[in-house]
Amino acid sequence: NSRIIAMYRIKNESRWIKQSLQSISDICEEIVILDDGSTDDTVKICENFPQVVEIHSQKELPFDETRDKNNLLKMALSRNPDFILTLDGDEVLMSNSKQRLFYELNVLYPNVNLFQLKALCVWDKPNQYRCDGVYNTTWSKKLFRLKDQPKNLQFKGTDFPGNSHCSAFPDNLIGKNEIVRSKVKFLHYGYYDEKLRRKKYEFLQKL
């Protein structure tokens, strides 16, 4: 099977990070993590997973999404992956993902470099998803192939404060004109309850 390395950029994700890491533990050979100053048990939870081979912790740095993504990318590339999977700490792959994902990567689409996964937005209850409006069309760029890619892959800055809304894939990645929408889905807990929704709104307002 292809060698997949996962990379996470997280902060205070102790509520969901264990589920997230468990969901990819049989898919990703190794996992690298950039922790942006967590004050909860996030790092301690991550350290309990043997697949987590590197945790870079930073504190009191100004928010800079591009800087963090480039640091994470360097960490992941140093592990010599065939693919890089990018996840947030509140995202959990569904349990039927492994066989389906490897079949797509190696058999169905061996020459495609970019893959989107469908997000299911968990809402108020563990088995309840929102599927109205924009919540029914949420595809996220999550996985990219490294074969024949430039050696100097990087994310570029944006015109937004803190380089927010940075690209999901490195800007000089080859093959952006063809993106496969995978059958693999993931659960997104970022809007699970009113407290989280308010927290997300306030964070975005600051930007």
Predicted regions mapped to residue ranges:
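Cell-envelope/extracellular polymer assembly enzymes that use nucleotide-activated donors
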Residues: 3-5
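Active-site nucleotide-sugar/metal-binding loop of Leloir-type enzymes
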Residues: 70-83
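Short beta-strand-to-loop acidic/aromatic patch adjacent to the donor-nucleotide binding site
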Residues: 80-94
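Short beta-strand/loop segment that forms part of the nucleotide-sugar
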Residues: 24, 29-37, 57-58
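Short, well-formed alpha-helical segments that are part of the catalytic scaffolds
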Residues: 10-27
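Catalytic-site signature of metal-activated, phosphate-bearing donor transferases
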Residues: 65-70, 94-207
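A conserved acidic beta->alpha catalytic loop
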Residues: 35-45, 61-62
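A short, glycine-/small-residue-rich helix N-cap motif at loop->alpha-helix starts
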Residues: 15, 60-69
